[in-house]
Amino acid sequence: MCDDEETTALVCDNGSGLVKAGFAGDDAPRAVFPSIVGRPRHQGVMVGMGQKDSYVGDEAQSKRGILTLKYPIEHGIITNWDDMEKIWHHTFYNELRVAPEEHPTLLTEAPLNPKANREKMTQIMFETFNVPAMYVAIQAVLSLYASGRTTGIVLDSGDGVTHNVPIYEGYALPHAIMRLDLAGRDLTDYLMKILTERGYSFVTTAEREIVRDIKEKLCYVALDFENEMATAASSSSLEKSYELPDGQVITIGNERFRCPETLFQPSFIGMESAGIHETTYNSIMKCDIDIRKDLYANNVLSGGTTMYPGIADRMQKEITALAPSTMKIKIIAPPERKYSVWIGGSILASLSTFQQMWITKQEYDEAGPSIVHRKCF
């Protein structure tokens, strides 16, 4: 299947924040770009400027001053199909430079994705892009595959949504899946807010990107939040400086760990919800008593919002406190977890045993979009 690039399968992981796309069998995605579509706010004044009616990804990001930006994927679920089509078109033709009608395509979906959504994805792939075959896989399951496991519980936290997904022998257990609408975007917003309290002003979408960069470079998770706050108050050992694009240097202290602490204490941003350690525990407790031991011993972190230094140690500490005292608890935090969904897709689509799993164009023509529920589960 993968001996030549002519028929190699494509793998496209559509996240709320970033699209990750590339070829099955590769060890990393070729294209990673923001999941945004921008449209000009005003009609172009200058004739012949070749102004397009829409821009996708990095180009939309760089022209954001004159555009209205929209994210077609909210909280992991596709909500705007016209814009989503534009993103897929951009992925195939501009980023990967392939003809989709020549490549089987593996797409990813959020856990508990509505049935109508899976059908719509299937329909667009076959009818708009004429793919020869396609498959839809649950993101968390792919992350687990990427870590070399088939049983475990995945904490997948990206830009738009966080899920706890217990998986047994390769199958997600839907009754025990937890969803938390708190993820990277909310943490960036929270960091903007607490930096404003320090006297720095960040308001525009352009400034938000700067804050996201500060977050990614300087934030970390404290092992003991109260202790860390005390240390930050009594000395400057935790302070770091960051140079803004205009050359101004700002200093940030306790904000570095107050920002991601929100994952463990959602009340920081006014959310009445359990933290990620409690949702993990609750998810395990909804599973059959016989498999809990396997889940506790295989806690896999996945997604960009699990990239904070210190998060694995903190999860270990918090879950140990909740679980039975004799239980062996292990947190697995692979270094490439930012892309582990994509990597899992790349592994899956290049397995010889997977080749019979594809939904083919012929099967689609015979059965229609609902075929996806029979073949992808």
From Swiss-Prot:
Cellular component, GO annotation: cell body; cytoplasm; cytoskeleton; filopodium; lamellipodium
Task: Recount the PTM note.
Answer: Oxidation of Met-46 and Met-49 by MICALs (mical1, mical2 or mical3) to form methionine sulfoxide promotes actin filament depolymerization. Mical1 and mical2 produce the (R)-S-oxide form. The (R)-S-oxide form is reverted by msrb1 and msrb2, which promote actin repolymerization.
Q: Which residues carry this modification: Tele-methylhistidine?
A: 75
Q: Which InterPro entries match?
A: Actin (IPR004000), Actin/actin-like_CS (IPR020902), Actin_CS (IPR004001), ATPase_NBD (IPR043129)
Which residues form the pro-region?
1-2
Q: What is its EC number?
A: 3.6.4.-
Modification N-acetylaspartate occurs at = 3
Question: What keywords tag this UniProt record?
Answer: Acetylation, ATP-binding, Cytoplasm, Cytoskeleton, Hydrolase, Methylation, Muscle protein, Nucleotide-binding, Oxidation
Q: Which family does it belong to?
A: Belongs to the actin family.
The function of this protein is: Actins are highly conserved proteins that are involved in various types of cell motility.
> Anything further noted?
Xenopus contains at least three sarcomeric alpha actin genes that are preferentially expressed in either heart or skeletal muscle. The cardiac versus skeletal expression patterns of actins are probably sequence-dependent. For example, cardiac actins contain a Glu at position 3 of the mature peptide, whereas skeletal actins contain an Asp at this position.
Q: What is this protein called?
A: Actin, alpha cardiac muscle 2
Organism in which the protein naturally occurs: Xenopus tropicalis (Western clawed frog)
